[in-house]
């Protein structure tokens, strides 16, 4: 739990009283490799901190092709935010790429703490600003304005060591390229 608190306080400081109230909402959950935390079409009500393991969020096009939107590793918050906030079904599926240990909480119960714990509300706002606004915008711009090699190098910085933990085709999908293109990029970088 201390590792989680440290990670949270990198975003925003919270009081001991707020921490106690928040941790009372957490319950452990295990998701096996290939298991689903939230499926496209489900109404998301929960969010989860990743204690251990790797998860991806992806969507499918009309033909069924999968596109990776993001990855979640230790310390990250996984949530179908659009579904939780809008009350509409999720467009994303959250799949475990390894066995995953989660600390799960009900989002509405978390919001219920805001009246007495303003620091938790501030934490959520800062998390949303950082992860779901700033980083999302930067990624969208990178997908259009940078070459695949630059996107791959940025992926390595954003997710250190992840490329050794997940299949390469998931990375290629995230970068918006084919697995063959990714192999060529990796080969060129190793040669230089």
Model-derived regions: residue spans:
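Cyclic nucleotide-binding regulatory module and flanking cytosolic helices
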Residues: 1-27, 83
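Cyclic nucleotide-binding regulatory domains
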Residues: 10, 36-96
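Phosphate-/nucleic-acid-contacting segments
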Residues: 146-192
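Short, well-ordered alpha-helical scaffold segment located
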Residues: 76-77, 109, 132, 181
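A small-molecule sensor/coupling module
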Residues: 90, 109-144
């Amino acid at each position: 739990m201390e590792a989680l608190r440290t990670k949270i306080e990198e975003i925003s400081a919270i009081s001991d009283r707020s921490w106690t109230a928040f941790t009372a909402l957490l319950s452990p959950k295990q998701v096996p490799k290939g298991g689903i935390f939230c499926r496209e079409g489900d109404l998301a009500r929960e969010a989860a901190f990743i204690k251990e393991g790797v998860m991806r969020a992806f969507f499918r096009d009309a033909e069924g092709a999968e596109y990776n939107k993001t990855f979640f590793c230790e310390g990250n918050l996984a949530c179908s935010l659009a579904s939780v906030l809008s009350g509409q079904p999720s467009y994303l599926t959250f799949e475990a790429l390894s066995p995953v240990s989660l600390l799960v909480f009900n989002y509405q119960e978390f919001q219920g703490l805001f009246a007495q714990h303003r620091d938790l509300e501030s934490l959520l706002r800062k998390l949303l600003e950082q992860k779901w606004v700033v980083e999302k915008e930067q990624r969208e711009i990178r997908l259009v304005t940078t070459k695949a090699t630059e996107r791959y190098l940025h992926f390595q910085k954003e997710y250190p060591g992840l490329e050794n933990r997940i299949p390469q085709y998931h990375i290629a999908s995230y970068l918006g390229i084919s697995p063959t293109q990714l192999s060529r990029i990796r080969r060129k970088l190793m040669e230089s």
